[in-house]
Structure formats: structure tokens, C-alpha cells
Amino acid sequence: MRMILLGPPGAGKGTQAKLISEKYSIPHISTGDIFRKNISEKTPLGVKAKEYMDKGQLVPDELTIDLVNDRLTHEDCKKGFLLDGFPRTVKQAEALEKFLTENNQSLDTALLIDVPSSFILERMTGRRVCPSCGASYHIKFNPPKIEGLCDVCKKEVIQRKDDTEETVKERIEVYDRQTQPLVDFYSSKDQLFVVDGTQSIDQVFETISNHIEGDK
């Protein structure tokens, strides 16, 4: 199975990617991991990517595409893969399609974990973390026993900067702008499968599994 995973921040993509990877024995490939590995190993592509990142610039599409294509040639991808964080643009999606076609392969499905903005806001802005021991909480779904204090070390729990309402709204807006053209691209090719991400983790995974196994 060759799949890509789409979804807004806070949709639970990481959790589902782990479950899919384990059940179907395919690698979960994230662009962040690819960048980090190539940079730490000082590969030619990694050195180029680091030059852009050190300047605070976005890594160009062409370089990102080369890095992903290189990763997809590895032995563990022969039976399939799950791409997370790529493609982000229609240009990248077209490049992925071209790469797969040239290797006599095709994408089986583009999974979209769909979650309304109001749900994401509640899920992400409610997150709290202990700055001392790292324990995680949620003011609605998993609150500490004593309000505002960590169960483990009794320190005051905090909201990370990434989880403030303003930051979350901005991330959702960026995601919507970037992803809608991709949704249209895969929908036009009948490769898009939309999953209701407001369900429980188990329900979302069951829906995805049924779709994957129906596609085999």
C-alpha cells in the first residue's frame, strides 16, 4: 500500500500513522525525519537543505522532492509507504505521481483526517504540560486531579506557546490555504478518502483499516 496522510494540526495524524505503519508493516515517512537524517549524516542533499534552513528560508520544492524521492528508493519502501507532511503543494503531488509512474507504481489512497476548526481549537488550546517533568494534560479531556497542578510533581502546569488560540488559528488558516488545492487534486483523481477525525482513535483507525483492506 502506498498512501499519503493529510489533516490539520491536532487531527491525530501521528497517532494514526503509527497504527497504520505497525498493522500493515510499511514505513511511516515524515519530511521532518528525512530532513533531520540527511542533515545529521551530511549527505549532499542534506547539506543543501541545511544551507536554506540556516538562513531561515523554506527549502525549495525541488530539493524537498529530491529528498523524498531518494527515501522512497530504499528497500523498506518496496511493499509500500505512508507519507506524512508530503506533498504539501500540487507541484509536489505532481512530482510524486511522476516518480511513482516512472517506477511502475501508483498511489493507492490519499487519507484526509477531517476535523472542524472548532474541534481543533478546543483540542489544542486545552492542552497543558508540566514544565518540570513533562507530564501532559488537557483541561477538558484529561485534567490534573488538582486544577492547575501536575499530578506527578505538583508544579504548576503551563500552556505551550504553540497551543495559544492565536497561534492555533494561524496554523489552521495556513493549513487550509495549503491543503485545499491538494484535496481538490486527489479528489479529481478519485484517490481521496475522507475520515471523520472527531471520532475516537479506535473508530478512526477502524474506518481507515476498512478502507485500506477494501482497496487491496
Curated annotation (Swiss-Prot):
Zn(2+) binds at C130, C133, C150, C153. ATP binds at G10, A11, G12, K13, G14, T15, R127, S136, Y137, Q199. Residues 126-163 are annotated as: LID. InterPro entries: Adenyl_kin_sub, Adenylat/UMP-CMP_kin, Adenylat_kinase_CS, Adenylate_kinase_lid-dom, P-loop_NTPase. AMP binds at T31, R36, Q57, L58, V59, G85, F86, P87, R88, Q92, R160, R171. It comes from the Bacteria. GO terms for biological process: AMP salvage. GO terms for cellular component: cytoplasm. Keywords: ATP-binding, Cytoplasm, Kinase, Metal-binding, Nucleotide biosynthesis, Nucleotide-binding, Transferase, Zinc. GO terms for molecular function: adenylate kinase activity; ATP binding; zinc ion binding. Its EC number is 2.7.4.3. Its main location: cytoplasm. It is an enzyme of class 2 (transferase). Residues 30-59 are annotated as: NMP. It catalyses: AMP + ATP = 2 ADP. It is found in: Cytoplasm. Pathway: Purine metabolism; AMP biosynthesis via salvage pathway; AMP from ADP: step 1/1. NCBIfam families: adk, PRK00279.1-1, PRK00279.1-2, PRK00279.1-3, PRK14527.1. Catalyzes the reversible transfer of the terminal phosphate group between ATP and AMP. Plays an important role in cellular energy homeostasis and in adenine nucleotide metabolism. Monomer. Belongs to the adenylate kinase family. Consists of three domains, a large central CORE domain and two small peripheral domains, NMPbind and LID, which undergo movements during catalysis. The LID domain closes over the site of phosphoryl transfer upon ATP binding. Assembling and dissambling the active center during each catalytic cycle provides an effective means to prevent ATP hydrolysis. Some bacteria have evolved a zinc-coordinating structure that stabilizes the LID domain. This is Adenylate kinase. It comes from Clostridium novyi (strain NT).
